[in-house]
């Protein structure tokens, strides 16, 4: 995969020997004749519908996932809504994990009722209960692995068996692991979503998402994207392709740092629980070890009940390497605090009672 990310999507011999593809900033694409225009002879017809710049990134990401194709979205959340709305319609029912990303939960709660789409949330650690939630109009199961906040690893093999049994579509947010550590297509998932904003871009300076699929699923996603007018800046595409070139190296360092730090935090008496699937004590460690090739740099910790939020704030404010802010996947380390137990848009199978801190380790030296 290191070789693929280094070379796919570029053809310097078609570009005056220049390794990086050019950035095409355009809306209009000109035809030589009216006959050519009417017959749509050109490969590219309008800037929003694709250019050589977007084609380079589409080809590259599709290759690392061994997918037939993909569409680019303006953000990770736009990729999620694109994946959802291309698979379900008015009158359908969908199942989502209880620990799903807060913005995805909010979209379901606020938009699905308006669109006459029914939904239920399931506990990703209780798949027997998942099967009882399936209705006659259920069309799809949405997955995250691990869960966004408390890092539950779902048994994807069992979920795929359920999907096959009831003829359901499946889609998954794979931002945490990327194709480097986990390829959902190997398990039969229909649609894979990733926030390019995070690891692929890797520099915390652009926002973008991607939705990958095969066959009819890809056709549906491409149709929705075109009808919804989804568009991504060519400059952002260029920077994402730049980030993709070093993805395996950055992910390896981020992963190394996170596991080292997680093991260190396991031995801190003020810490009650380290939510990192690569740790042997994690409830889903065996599932992670079975399905994943590695762990990314994002995890969380819960402090003991007697540790106050003020004390954790003081600790966070004193850190020199870690920035305080949302998002993750870039080259620098970040921390953020969330009230997981009381948020309207965050629900988890494990509810932390102590102060919760989410940690992302970047590319720094672990000894610093």
Identify the function of each model-found stretch.
Residues 240-249, 297-305, 358-362:
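Short, well-ordered beta-strand elements within core beta-sheets of diverse protein domains
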Residues 109, 118-120, 131-132, 136-139, ...:
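PLP-dependent enzyme catalytic core of the Aspartate aminotransferase-like
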Residues 28-29, 213-217, 244, 303-307:
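Short loop segments at secondary-structure junctions
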Residues 5-7, 11, 70-268, 275:
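Conserved PLP-enzyme active-site core in the AAT-like
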Residues 29-35, 217, 340-343:
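Active-site/binding-pocket entry motifs
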Residues 1-51, 59, 357-359:
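N-terminal "arm"/small-domain region of PLP-dependent enzymes with the aminotransferase-like
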Residues 28-78, 103-110:
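Conserved N-terminal alpha-helix of the aminotransferase class I/II PLP-enzyme fold
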Residues 259-320, 324-331, 340-350:
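Conserved small-domain helix->loop->beta segment predominantly found in fold-type I
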């Amino acid at each position: 995969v290191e070789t693929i990310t280094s070379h796919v999507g570029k053809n310097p011999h078609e570009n005056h020997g220049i390794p990086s593809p050019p950035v095409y900033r355009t809306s209009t694409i000109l035809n030589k004749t009216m006959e050519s225009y009417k017959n749509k002879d050109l490969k590219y017809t309008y800037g929003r519908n694709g250019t050589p710049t977007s084609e380079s990134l589409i080809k590259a990401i599709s290759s690392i996932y061994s997918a037939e194709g993909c569409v680019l979205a303006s953000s990770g959340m736009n990729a999620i809504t694109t994946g959802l709305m291309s698979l379900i319609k008015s009158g359908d029912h969908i199942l989502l994990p209880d620990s799903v990303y807060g913005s995805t939960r909010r979209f379901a709660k606020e938009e699905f009722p308006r669109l006459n789409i029914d939904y239920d949330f399931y506990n990703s650690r209780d798949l027997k209960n998942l099967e009882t939630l399936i209705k006659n109009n259920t069309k799809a199961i949405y997955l995250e692995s691990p869960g966004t906040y408390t890092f539950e690893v779902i048994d994807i093999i069992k979920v795929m068996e359920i999907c096959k049994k009831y003829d359901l579509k499946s889609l998954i947010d794979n931002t945490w692991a990327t194709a480097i550590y986990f390829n959902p297509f190997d398990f039969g998932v229909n649609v894979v979503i990733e926030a390019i904003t995070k690891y692929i871009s890797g520099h915390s300076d652009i926002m973008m998402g991607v939705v990958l699929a095969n066959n009819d699923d890809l056709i549906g996603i491409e149709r929705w994207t075109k009808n919804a007018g989804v568009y991504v800046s060519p400059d952002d595409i260029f920077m994402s392709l730049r980030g993709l070139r070093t993805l395996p190296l950055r992910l390896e360092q981020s992963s190394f740092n996170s596991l080292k730090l997680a093991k260190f935090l396991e031995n801190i008496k003020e810490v009650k629980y380290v939510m990192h699937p690569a740790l042997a004590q994690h409830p889903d460690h065996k599932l992670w070890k079975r399905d994943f090739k590695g762990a990314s740099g994002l995890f969380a910790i819960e402090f003991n009940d007697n540790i106050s939020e003020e004390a954790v704030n003081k600790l966070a404010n004193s850190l020199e390497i870690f920035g305080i802010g949302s998002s993750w996947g870039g080259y620098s380390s970040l921390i953020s605090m969330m009230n997981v137990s009381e948020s309207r848009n965050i629900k988890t199978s494990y509810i932390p009672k102590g102060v919760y801190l989410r940690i992302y380790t970047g590319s720094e030296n672990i000894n610093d």
